[in-house]
Design a protein with these regions (language model features):
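Conserved glycine-rich "GG(E/T)P / GGGxP" loop and the immediately following alpha-helix
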Residues: 155
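Sec-dependent N-terminal signal peptides of Gram-positive bacterial secreted proteins and lipoproteins
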Residues: 2-23
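N-terminal secretory/targeting leader peptides
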Residues: 21-28, 44-140, 150, 158-356
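Bacterial lipoprotein signal-peptidase II cleavage site
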Residues: 18-39
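Short stretches within intrinsically disordered, low-complexity N-terminal or propeptide regions
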Residues: 7, 12, 34-36, 42-43, ...
Length: 356
């Protein structure tokens, strides 16, 4: 824990984005107690593993699925190791934003990280393939692909950057919700001021669809929707409730246009110094935690849908998704990135072969 002291202090003072979907503590909510851990063993467990404590972090608040996931992961690991492996759980921006905490994990200040996959792409561009629009029709497809050999192929190169890939979790399919008009077809977004994350890939999509994308950090979103700077947002269903960004929302359209992942990774030096038996438990339970995140997103989306409907939001559960795909030109849309350093045609073809 000594190595965390300075980072905890810095994280407590920093104003940063929340994890994996950029969640922040909702109004009226209370911050969960960060720094929780499963009970540590004082003697070797029945499997002969020496007691060990590792730090795990996800920047989101207690309502975010990534934070729920690392809490469950800590439980699973402790149980599978007969109490020998303790994961010291931190969350709620305590150790910084996605970008800050990923860098801290690369440096070894944090042992294990579960953060938005997009946060890794600033230095690991190969993962940008997962930010392509309409790559997956559902979260179920994303799970099958990213937790297969293809997922290992996408993320194996992380070791060159001081990280070891463990599993890929879920943070939801992105949809569109608006303050001023229903959206059923691609034609309905013409000129629409839609807030998107500060990512060129997101900007490209909405510009191609004829909307007016506005790149804003998440903490600016609620105010932007209130004052008209933005008229729409693209987020997973549960994010609107977890982030309290639905007060001005009147319409919600389930277009499933982009999937958001969360990546579980370990500091490479920490990982390489672990007993192989510990590595096996961490890897296997990371896969179980990834599945937990997908299942929990599904449940939280259902709950959030009811909350939004009770607040008067009108849902279009069957929009004309094909009109959006057609407006982008189908899979040919991806060709514009062929000259980008991160573009890998063979990898993209492997993904498409699984989902088309």
């Amino acid at each position: 824990m000594k190595k965390l002291a300075s980072l905890v202090l810095a994280g407590a003072m920093a104003f940063s984005l929340a994890a994996c979907g950029n969640n922040s503590t909702p109004a009226g909510g209370s911050s969960a107690n960060a720094g929780t851990s499963t009970p540590a063993a004082s003697t070797p467990a029945s499997g002969g593993i020496e007691p060990i404590e590792l730090t795990i972090y996800s920047p989101g608040n207690e309502n975010s699925v990534p934070t729920k996931t690392i809490i469950e992961y800590a439980r699973l690991v402790n149980e599978a190791s007969d109490g020998a492996i303790t994961l010291d759980v931190h969350h709620s921006n305590e150790l910084g934003s996605d970008a800050e905490s990923i860098e801290s994990t690369r440096m070894g200040t944090i042992d294990l990280i579960f953060a938005g996959t997009s946060g890794f792409t600033s230095f690991y561009e190969k993962a940008k393939v997962l930010d392509l629009p309409f790559l997956f029709d559902s979260a179920e497809q994303a799970y099958e692909v990213t937790n297969s050999e293809i997922g290992e192929q996408i993320f194996s190169g992380l070791e060159e950057f001081g990280l070891v890939f463990l599993s890929e979790g879920d943070n939801g399919m992105r949809h569109i919700s608006t303050t001023n008009r229903p959206v059923h077809t691609a034609a309905d977004v013409q000129g629409l001021k839609i807030r998107v994350p500060e990512s060129q890939l997101y900007l490209d999509v909405w510009q191609a669809l004829g909307a007016t994308p506005v790149a804003l950090a998440l903490p600016e979103l609620a105010l932007a929707l209130s004052n008209g700077t933005a008229e729409a947002q693209d987020n997973a269903t549960y994010h609107l409730v977890a982030n309290a960004t639905y007060d001005d929302i009147k319409y919600f359209s389930n277009i499933n246009y982009m999937w958001m992942g969360c990546t579980m990774a370990a500091n490479a030096n920490t990982w390489n110094g672990l007993d192989p038996a510990v590595q096996e438990i961490l890897k296997e339970q990371a896969k179980a935690a990834a599945k937990y995140s997908f299942d929990t997103i599904a449940t939280d989306n259902e709950t959030a849908t009811k909350t939004l409907q009770d607040a008067g939001v009108e849902f279009d559960f069957e929009p004309d998704v094909q009109s959006f795909k057609d407006a982008l030109g189908g899979d040919a849309y991806y060709d514009q990135y062929k000259d980008e350093s991160w573009y890998d045609q063979e990898l993209l073809d492997a993904i498409l072969a699984e989902v088309r």
